Amino acid sequence: MRKGILCVILGCFFSILCHGQVSFGVNASITSSTLSENFAKSKTGIQIGVLCNYELNEDLTLLSGLGYVVKGVNGLWSDLNYSQQLKMFDVQLSYLELPLSLGYKIPIGNNIRLIPNVGIFLSYGLHGHSEIKSINFEAEEVFRFADNSWNPFKDEKFNDWAQTTVNAFERWDYGVRSGLNIEAGNIICHGAYDLGFNKVWNGYGKMGNALKSRSLIIGIGYKF
């Protein structure tokens, strides 16, 4: 149901673009992402893409574009903590992402304006990488298992540790976005926070809980 509503909204947006004044640009950002669970630790990634904005009137603007974004999560395998040697689960996820936000333009100087904005985002997982790191507290060292990397968009079963299955991440993600842009001429500085609605990961086998994505984005762009 939510996916259908998002598709309708995006379809209306692109129909508007065909009949109005549109500006384009490019941007690059740093991301910090995690999941909605206490064990999850944030992971730093990047985002690069194109901007596509539509001026509704003197006060309102639609902000959109298309980007390649790298997200992920770090966290301890607390469910499998049988000894002093823990296993750390690292995930890197790459998405094609389409945001759509409504912004309100606030002039604060000569050709400078603030644009607080709220909207939605829709992402599709292209590829990813997962691996387990071992933390040996007695030796105070961290080392990687060479044979324990896999595609996080597919289920992975480990027979060595209580026949544990790491469930696949969902490729589709969507949710709400709130942000703030600062435009100075053709330069755009932007920040946003994404709150995912889709349950992108169900954890380990039947033991896990459905988790949702959380992302902080800070970047800079140039409008042609």
Question: Can you say where each PLM-predicted feature lies in the sequence?
Answer:
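Short glycine/proline- and aromatic-enriched beta-strand/turn motifs that initiate or cap beta-hairpins
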Residues: 20-51
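Repeated loop/turn-to-beta-strand initiation elements of outer-membrane beta-barrel proteins
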Residues: 22-24, 59-62, 112, 186-191
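Residues on the lipid-exposed face of transmembrane beta-strands in outer-membrane beta-barrel proteins
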Residues: 26-30, 48-54, 66-68, 98-104, ...
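Extracellular loop and loop/strand-boundary signature of outer-membrane beta-barrel proteins
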Residues: 34-38, 83-89, 163-166, 202-208
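Outer-membrane beta-barrel translocator domains and adjoining extracellular loop/strand segments
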Residues: 36-43, 74-81, 128-136, 201-206
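Glycine- and aromatic-enriched membrane insertion/assembly motifs of diderm outer-membrane
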Residues: 40-88, 93-96, 224
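Residues that define the transmembrane beta-barrel architecture of outer-membrane proteins
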Residues: 42-46, 92-98, 112, 172-176, ...
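Predominantly the C-terminal beta-signal and adjacent terminal strand-loop region
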Residues: 76-77, 164-166, 171-224
